[in-house]
Amino acid sequence: MFKENTTMMMDSNPPLFDQYEFLLQSTAHLQPFNNGNLPTNSVMEECQLPLIDLKGLKSSDEKERVACRREIFEASEEWGFFQVINHGIHTELLNRMNKEQIKLFGVPFEKKFTSGILDNSYRWGTPTATHPNQFSWSEAFHIPLTKVSEAACYGDFIYLREVMEEVASAMSKVARKLAGVLVESMGQRKELLEDICDESTCFLRLNHYPICPFSGEVSGLVPHTDSDFLTILHQDSGGGLQVMKGSQWLAVKPNPQALVVNIGDLLQVNTPTPISFHPIIYHSLFFQFPYYLIY
C-alpha cells in the first residue's frame, strides 16, 4: 500500500466531516434508519473469493479452456464475485496507476471541484443522502472511456493521461474476454458483444476513501449492487471490501495481484446469479479503480 503525506491529504479532502455532522444533527430526532442489515467494522469472517487463473482460457488443451470457462460461470452463479490472476495487466502498470491517483487526489479540494479535470467528473460524498447511514465517505472521478484520450481533460496531469490510456486499454481486453465467456454461457453469440459494447458504454472510475473519524459508523461506499453489466476492480492491500453471500456479510481478503470481478445487475437479469450487495468498510485509507462495462 502506498504511503502518503497525511497533512497534504487532509488539506485536499472534501468536506465530508461537515456534511456528515449536518446529517447527524438534522436526523437526531428520527428513529434509527434501517438500510438493510448494514455491515460494521466489527470482526467478521474473512473470505477468499473464488480465484480463477485466466491462463486456462489460452490453453492449447480444449479441456483446460472448457474448465476455465466453467469456473467463471460457476463463480458468477454462486457468488456474483470472483478474482482473476494471470489477467495480462502488469503489476508495474497497476502500481503506476495507484501512484498517479495519489497525486490526483492530493490536489486541493477546490481545484478538484471547480477545475473540470477529467471531463468534470469529480464527485464526493452522497448529495442525495437524507440520513447518515446513506452517506458514503469517499471521493471519485468517473470518466467515460470516450474521454480518456482527450488531452484537454487532464490539465497539468500529463503523465496521468498516459497511464490511464494504458490502463483503459488493458482493462478493456480483460473485460471483453470475461464478458465473452459470460455471454456464451447464456447461450448467446460471442459476437453479440461487438454489437452492444463500445467505448460509450464503458467507464473508468478512480476512488479514494479518506481516513474517517466515524469509521465504526459509516461506509466508504454504502451497501449497493452495481447497476452495470460487469465491474472489474483493482484495490490496494488495505482491503475493506465486503460482500453479502446469502444473509451473511463477509470481508474479502485483499489480493493485490488479482483483479476483482463483480457481475452487475444488467447481467443478473439474464442469469440466476445471486444479488451481491457490497459496501466499502474502513480498515485504512486506500485507493482503488474499477472499470465498468455498462450496456
Regions found by a protein language model. Give the residues of each.
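Peripheral, non-catalytic segments flanking oxidoreductase cores
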Residues: 1-295
